[in-house]
UniProtKB/Swiss-Prot annotation:
Annotated spans, Disordered: 246-271, 293-313
Main subcellular localisation: cytoplasm
Pfam families to which the protein is assigned, alphabetical: EF-G_D2, GTP_EFTU, GTP_EFTU_D2, IF-2, IF2_N
Protein name (record): Translation initiation factor IF-2
Keyword annotations of the record: Cytoplasm, GTP-binding, Initiation factor, Nucleotide-binding, Protein biosynthesis
Region G5, annotated ranges: 557-559
Biased composition (Basic and acidic residues): 249-266
GO cellular component: cytoplasm
Signal peptide (residue range): none
Annotated segments matching region G4: 521-524
Protein's cellular compartments: Cytoplasm
Sequence similarity: Belongs to the TRAFAC class translation factor GTPase superfamily. Classic translation factor GTPase family. IF-2 subfamily.
Binding site residues for GTP: 420-427, 467-471, 521-524
Length: 914
C-alpha cells in the first residue's frame, strides 16, 4: 500500500514542466484549491494532479498537440529517408545495368541511326550531317586506326534518299539491338536531372550551350523538334562510344577532342555529340538530399533552413549595428566637464577660433583658456555635429593598458568574497578559517569595512578572502568587492531564511558574472532547516547541485568548524574550472585596486591594496586616483612587514600623500616625476570641477527653490574613521529624499570632528554626523556655543533610519547621551594581577564611578564600556571634579596609552530634532 501511495504522488514542478507553465502558477492554483503545499517542490496526489490538468486544460491540449505534431514530423521524416534510400538503390541497379548493356551493341548501325535525323530537319540537311563526320574524322588521330574505314564509308554515301532504306533494313535484320537501344535511350532521360550538374565542367558542354543559344536565336520555330532529335542522337551516340572505346579514357579523349576542331561547320554541330558521362554516387546522393531538403513536408530540414536564414539575418543586423557604432564613434568626443575651447578644438579637429566664434554667435563671450560649463560644451558639440560624453578626471588621464604575454601568465590564488545577510555568520566563517578573533572589534557583529585576508591551506595552496559588510547601506562597497572577486561564498543561516540582502548579494554576483558557492551556516542549531533554504534559494535564482543546478552547496557550522574544509575544497575546485591566471612577470609595472583606506596617527595614510598584476615592491612610485606616493612599507593583514606582493595578494601599503578612495586603481609608474605629473594633472581637473561647482551651485539653487516653491535641503557634514564608511554613508543618504526636503552632503572627510567642520556647519546651517569618531575639546565647545546638532553613530543603518524618519516627520523621542566630563591619561602604570592603570587629569565636568565611558585615541573611538575603578591617591572615590588628578582602570579593556581621552556620559531621553 505504501509503495502504491508513494507512486501516485507527483511533484508540482514536474507537473508544471509537463504542462509547460510556470511552477508558481501551479502552486498558486493548488493553494486556492485547498492543497497543503509549501513550495514548488511539494508533492500532490493523483486527484489534485487531475484537478491541475483540468484547470490547465488549454495548456495540456496545446502540449499534446505539439507532441503529436513532433511525432508526425518524425514519422514523415523516417518515411522520406526510406524513400530516398529506395531511390538510391534503384539508381544503383540502373547504373549497373547501364554498364553491362552496351557490350553486345552493333558498331555498324550506330552511324546509320545518326543519318536518320536529316529528313526531320529538311531545310538544312547539310548542317545535320557534318556531326556524323566529326567524331569519326577526329578519332583516327588517336591509336585505333581500324575504326576509320568503318565510319568513313557511310560518309561517302551521302545521298539522303538512300539513307532511309538503309536505316530500315538493319533494324529489321537485328531485332536484338532494338531492345537494347530503348534501354539506353530511356536511361539518359531519367538520369538527365542528375547528369545536368556534372556536364557544366567540360569544354564540350560550353560549346553545346553556345550552339543551342545561336540556334534558338535564329530558328525559334524548330526549337522543339531540334531538342527531341538531340535527345535521340545523344542516346545513340552514347551507345556507340561505350562500345567503340572499351576503356573510359579513350572515350573521354574522343569526346573532348572536337573542341579544338579547325572547321567552322564542325564547330556548329559538335555540341550534339556528347561523351558518355559516368554516373557518380556523390552526385546521386547530393541530388537526393537537395530534393528532400526542398520538400515542404520535411520539418527538420525546413527548421534548419529557417534557423540558417534567421542566423544570417542576425549576422547582417549585427554587422549593421557594428557599422552604426563605428560611425557614432567617429562623432563621439569624450571630454571632462569644464573643458576649455582650446581642448574642445583639439578633440573635434577644429581651430580654437571656430569654437570661440560659435560661442559668440550663441551670445557667450569666452577666451581661449576659459572653462566652459557642461551645457555650453553640449551645445557646441551639437552645433558641430558631435555627440559629447563626459568622463571623470581619472578616466581622462588613464594610463594605457598593456597586454599580458602568455608566457608570463601563471595560475594565481582565487579572490573569494564572502557575502550574505546581517548576522548570518560571514565574519564568523572567516574567523574560523583564519583562526583568529576578527569579530571582537566589530560593532554589534556588523562588519564596517572591507577586510582583505590571505589564507594558506595545509597543502600549500592560498585563497584571498574579502569580507564585505553585510547591510544594504554597503551596496556600493559590496559591488566593489564583486568587481575584484573571482568566486562568491553566499552565507545563509539555516535557522533563518533568504533575506532581501541575500537576494541583493546574489544580484551583485550575477551582474559581475561571478560563480556562487552556497554555504548554509548554523546547521548545528536544532531549528535549522536546510531544505527550506535550498527551496528559497531556487526561487531567488540560485539552483544548487543537489537540485540539478550549477551552484555548489555546503552545509557548515562556522562556530564548530563543521564542513569548512569541504567548503574550501569546493571553492578551489571552482577556481580550477575557471583557470584563473595572473601576470607574474617582474619586468612589468604592477597595478592593483584600493580596497580600503584609513588614517593612522603614526603611519599616516594606510591603504589595503589587492594586487592584480605584477609585483608591488617597496620603493615603487605610484598613482592612485588623485593621490600619488612611494611605497614606504608593505604589510600583510597581521601587520608583518613583507618586501613584495604578487597577484591576488592583499597588502597594506604605506606611503600615500593623500587619502585615496576605495575602488581607485593603484598604478606603479616608471619614475617619481611621471607619478607626480599624472597626479597633479588629475588634481587640477578635480579642483577646477569643485571650484566651478561651488561657485555655480548657490545661484542655481536659489533659482530652483523659487521655481519649486522653496524646496528645502538638509545639509549634512560627514566625518568617519575610514573612506569606505564615508562612501557607503554618502550613497545611502543621497538616496533618501521626499517631496519637501532632500539631503545634500556639503563636506565629508576622514578623521575626528574639528573646529573647521563646526564653523562650516554653522555657516551652512548643517548637521554633523560622526561615524565612529568624536570631536576634539575645542570643536565640542564651539558646537555647544553655536547650538549645532552633532550626532554620533557606530552602525551605518542607524544613521540612514534616523535621517529617513526625520524627513518623514516621524521622529519619536530618542535616548540621547549627555556628556558628564572628560579626563586625559598622562601616565600608565602596570599593576600586577590588575593590569594597566592610567594616571589621569580631569579636563572638564565631573567623572563619576558608575558613568558609562568611551576611550578616544586621536578622536577615534577605541573602546566603549564602564570604569572598573576610580581612585584618588589610594582611596576609592565616587566622582572626581575638573582640575583634579585620579587613577582609573577600565572594565574588560587593558590597552590604555598616554594621551588617550576618557569621556564619561549618561543616557537621557530627549525629544528628537534634525
Amino acid at each position: 500500500m505504501a509503495i502504491e501511495e508513494k507512486q501516485s504522488r507527483f511533484r508540482i514542478s514536474d507537473i508544471a514542466k509537463e504542462l509547460q507553465v510556470s511552477p508558481r502558477e501551479v502552486l498558486q492554483f493548488v493553494k486556492q484549491a485547498g492543497g497543503k503545499v509549501a513550495s514548488t517542490s511539494s508533492m500532490v496526489g493523483e486527484d489534485m494532479r487531475d484537478m491541475i490538468f483540468g484547470n490547465f486544460s488549454q495548456e495540456k491540449k496545446r502540449v499534446d498537440e505539439a507532441r503529436k505534431i513532433r511525432a508526425e514530423k518524425q514519422k514523415r521524416l523516417t518515411r522520406l529517408e526510406e524513400q530516398s534510400r529506395k531511390a538510391y538503390e534503384k539508381e544503383q541497379q540502373l547504373k549497373e545495368s547501364l554498364s553491362i548493356a552496351p557490350l553486345p551493341a552493333p558498331v555498324l548501325h550506330a552511324p546509320e541511326v545518326k543519318i536518320e535525323i536529316p529528313p526531320e530537319t529538311a531545310t538544312t540537311p547539310v548542317a545535320a550531317e557534318p556531326p556524323a563526320i566529326l567524331p569519326v574524322v577526329s578519332t583516327p588521330q588517336p591509336e585505333p586506326v581500324a575504326d576509320l574505314p568503318l565510319v568513313t564509308e557511310p560518309v561517302v554515301a551521302e545521298p539522303v534518299a538512300e539513307a532511309e532504306p538503309v536505316v530500315e533494313a538493319p533494324v529489321a535484320e537485328t531485332a536484338g539491338p532494338e531492345v537494347m537501344t530503348p534501354l539506353v535511350q530511356t536511361l539518359p532521360e531519367s538520369m538527365q536531372a542528375y547528369e545536368a550538374p556534372q556536364k557544366i565542367g567540360g569544354l564540350t558542354v560550353l560549346g553545346t550551350i553556345d550552339v543551342i543559344s545561336e540556334a534558338e536565336r535564329k530558328k525559334k520555330s524548330r526549337k522543339k523538334s531540334f531538342r527531341e532529335s538531340a535527345v535521340e542522337l545523344k542516346g545513340e551516340f552514347e551507345n556507340v562510344l561505350s562500345v567503340d572505346s572499351e576503356d573510359g579514357e579513350a572515350a573521354k579523349k574522343k569526346a573532348a577532342k572536337p573542341d579544338g576542331g579547325e572547321d567552322v561547320g564542325v564547330k556548329k554541330k559538335k555540341g550534339k555529340k556528347k561523351k558518355k558521362v559516368e554516373i557518380d554516387d556523390k552526385v546521386i546522393s547530393k541530388n537526393i538530399k537537395s530534393t528532400i531538403s526542398g520538400m515542404d513536408d520535411s520539418g527538420l530540414s525546413g527548421s534548419r533552413q529557417k534557423f540558417r536564414k534567421q542566423r544570417r539575418m542576425e549576422r547582417e543586423r549585427e554587422f549593421e549595428e557594428a557599422e552604426a557604432m563605428r560611425e557614432a564613434e567617429k562623432t563621439l568626443i569624450r571630454v571632462t566637464e569644464y573643458a576649455s575651447p582650446h581642448e574642445l578644438a583639439e578633440l573635434m579637429g577644429l581651430t580654437a577660433k571656430e569654437i570661440i566664434q560659435k560661442c559668440f554667435s550663441m551670445g557667450k563671450f569666452v577666451t581661449i583658456n576659459q572653462r566652459l560649463d557642461k551645457e555650453t560644451i553640449e551645445l557646441i558639440g551639437l552645433e558641430f555635429g558631435f555627440e559629447v560624453e563626459f568622463i571623470s578626471e581619472i578616466e581622462a588621464t588613464t594610463t594605457e593598458e598593456l597586454v599580458d604575454n602568455a608566457e608570463d601568465l601563471q595560475t594565481r590564488p582565487p579572490v573569494v568574497t564572502i557575502m550574505g545577510h546581517v548576522d548570518h555568520g560571514k565574519t564568523s566563517l572567516l574567523d574560523y578559517i583564519r583562526r583568529s578573533n576578527v569579530v571582537a572589534g566589530e560593532s554589534g557583529g556588523i562588519t564596517q569595512h572591507i577586510g582583505a585576508y590571505e589564507v594558506s591551506l595545509d597543502d600549500g595552496r592560498h585563497i584571498t578572502f574579502l569580507d564585505t559588510p553585510g547591510h544594504e547601506a554597503f551596496t556600493a562597497m559590496r559591488a566593489r568587492g564583486a568587481q575584484v572577486t573571482d568566486i562568491v561564498i553566499l552565507v545563509v543561516a539555516a535557522d533563518d531564511s533568504v533575506m532581501p540582502q541575500t537576494i541583493e548579494a546574489i544580484n551583485h554576483a550575477k551582474a559581475a558574472g561571478v560563480p556562487i558557492v552556497v554555504a548554509i551556516n548554523k546547521i548545528d542549531k536544532p531549528e535549522a532547516n536546510v531544505e527550506k533554504i535550498k527551496a528559497q534559494l531556487s526561487e531567488a535564482g540560485v539552483l544548487v547541485e543537489d537540485w540539478g543546478g550549477e551552484s555548489q552547496c555546503q552545509e557548515i557550522s562556522a562556530k564548530k568548524g563543521i564542513g569548512i574544509s569541504e567548503l574550501l575544497e569546493k571553492v578551489l575546485a571552482e577556481a580550477e574550472i575557471r583557470e584563473l591566471k595572473g601576470n607574474y612577470s617582474r619586468d612589468i609595472l604592477a597595478s592593483g585596486v584600493i580596497v580600503e583606506s584609513e588614517l593612522d596617527k603614526g603611519k599616516g595614510v594606510v591603504s589595503t591594496v589587492l594586487v592584480q598584476r605584477g609585483f608591488l615592491k617597496v620603493g615603487d612610485p605610484f598613482v592612485a586616483g588623485n593621490s600619488m606616493g612611494k611605497v614606504r612599507a608593505l604589510m600583510d593583514e597581521r601587520g608583518k612587514r613583507i618586501h613584495e606582493a604578487g597577484p591576488s595578494t592583499p597588502v597594506r601599503v604605506l606611503g600615500f600623500e593623500d587619502m585615496p578612495q576605495s575602488g581607485d586603481v593603484l598604478t606603479v609608474m616608471a619614475s617619481d616625476r611621471d607619478a607626480r605629473d599624472l597626479a597633479q594633472k588629475r588634481q587640477i581637473i578635480k579642483r577646477e570641477h569643485e571650484f566651478r561647482r561651488s561657485t555655480r551651485v548657490k545661484l542655481d539653487s536659489i533659482a530652483r527653490q523659487i521655481k519649486e516653491g522653496l524646496k528645502k535641503e538638509l545639509s549634512v557634514i560627514i566625518k568617519a574613521d575610514t573612506d569606505g564608511s564615508i562612501q557607503a554613508l554618502a550613497d545611502g543618504l543621497m538616496k533618501i529624499h521626499n517631496e519637501e526636503v532632500k539631503v545634500q552632503i556639503i563636506h565629508q572627510g576622514v578623521g575626528q570632528i574639528t573646529e573647521t567642520d563646526v564653523l562650516l556647519a554653522a555657516a551652512s546651517d548643517a548637521i554633523i554626523i560622526g561615524f565612529r569618531v568624536r570631536p576634539n575639546v575645542n570643536a565640542k565647545r564651539l558646537a555647544e556655543k553655536e547650538d549645532l546638532d552633532v550626532r554620533f553613530y557606530s552602525v551605518i543603518y542607524h544613521v540612514l533610519e534616523d535621517v529617513e524618519k526625520a524627513l518623514e516627520g516621524m521622529l519619536s523621542p530618542e535616548l540621547h547621551e549627555e556628556s558628564l566630563g572628560s579626563l586625559e591619561i598622562r601616565q600608565v602604570f602596570r599593576v600586577p594581577k590588575v593590569g594597566n592603570v592610567g594616571g589621569a587629569y580631569v579636563l572638564e565636568g565631573k567623572v563619576s564611578r558608575d558613568a558609562k565611558v568611551r576611550l578616544l585615541r586621536d578622536g577615534v573611538q577605541i573602546f566603549e564600556g564602564q570604569l572598573d575603578s576610580l581612585k584618588r591617591f589610594k582611596d576609592d572615590v565616587k566622582e572626581v571634579d575638573a582640575g583634579y588628578e585620579c587613577g582609573v582602570s577600565l572594565k574588560g579593556y587593558d590597552d590604555i596609552k598616554v594621551g588617550d581621552v576618557i569621556e564619561a556620559y549618561k543616557i537621557v531621553e530627549k525629544k528628537r530634532k534634525l
